């Protein structure tokens, strides 16, 4: 099993590219798609009906550990369900490394996750890291200002609290992750501040699967 992760900031267009790939390769039984389990996150609600994703964006200090553990477990669960499949390529929308190097690390650095919480999180990460190593990362790099405008335009539930400053921080941690991971695996960076056509998506798909089979 080879895992290829589509990476990018919130609003970078990674989900759009992921959907394009999913449709483009829909008839290939050897390619499996695992999107970011947002629907699972949105299903976890308090007694007032507010989901954990919305609560996290509103109060990251209070909900950082709960959210990151939940995100890790849901990603891990999806991977485990297909782990017995042989000779397949798995395309994921973000991955366990994204959670670790970007979101958990950023929350810890900002003192929104305590030392004990971060150590517990790292125990979870290292326990399963070897089991689900990523073969390649495909990073869609987009200016945070453009990401911010896209987020406002799409008005997705739970995202109304996302600030430009948060997106700028996310970009920095994405870049740091790619720098670290590029020393271990194949990492491709695509700059996508322009409108992307279907022909460009097809070219990206060629790059994505180069030497994977």
Question: Which residue ranges define each predicted feature?
Answer:
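P-loop (Walker A) phosphate-binding loop of NTP-binding proteins
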Residues: 9
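Conserved lysine of the Walker
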Residues: 14
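Hydrophobic anchor at the beta1->P-loop junction of P-loop NTPases
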Residues: 6
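Conserved nucleotide-sensing/catalytic segment adjacent to the nucleotide-binding pocket
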Residues: 47-89, 108-112
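NTP-dependent small-molecule kinase module
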Residues: 148-213
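A glycine- and Lys/Arg-enriched "phosphate-lid" helix/loop adjacent to the NTP-binding pocket
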Residues: 100-172
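Conserved substrate/cofactor phosphate-moiety recognition/catalytic segment
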Residues: 23-68, 102
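Post-Walker A alpha-helix
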Residues: 17-18
């Amino acid at each position: 099993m080879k895992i290829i992760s589509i990476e990018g900031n919130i609003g970078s267009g990674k989900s759009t590219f992921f959907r394009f790939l999913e449709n483009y390769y829909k008839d290939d039984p050897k390619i499996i798609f695992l999107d970011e389990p947002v629907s699972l996150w949105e299903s976890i609600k308090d007694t007032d009906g507010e989901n954990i994703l919305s609560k996290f964006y509103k109060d990251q200090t209070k909900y950082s550990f709960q959210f990151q553990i939940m995100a890790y477990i849901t990603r891990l669960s999806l991977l485990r369900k297909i782990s017995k499949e042989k000779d397949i390529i798995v395309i994921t929308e973000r991955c366990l490394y994204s959670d670790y190097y970007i979101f958990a690390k950023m929350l810890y650095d900002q003192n929104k996750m305590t030392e004990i919480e971060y150590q517990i999180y790292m125990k979870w990460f290292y326990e399963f890291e070897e089991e689900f190593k990523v073969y390649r990362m495909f990073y869609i790099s987009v200016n945070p200002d453009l990401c911010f405008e896209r987020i406002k335009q799409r008005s997705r539930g739970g995202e109304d609290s996302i600030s430009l400053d948060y997106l700028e921080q996310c970009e920095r941690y994405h870049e740091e992750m790619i720098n670290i991971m590029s020393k271990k695996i194949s990492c491709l960076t695509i700059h996508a501040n322009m409108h992307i056509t279907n022909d460009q998506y097809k070219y990206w798909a060629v790059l994505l699967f180069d030497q994977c089979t």
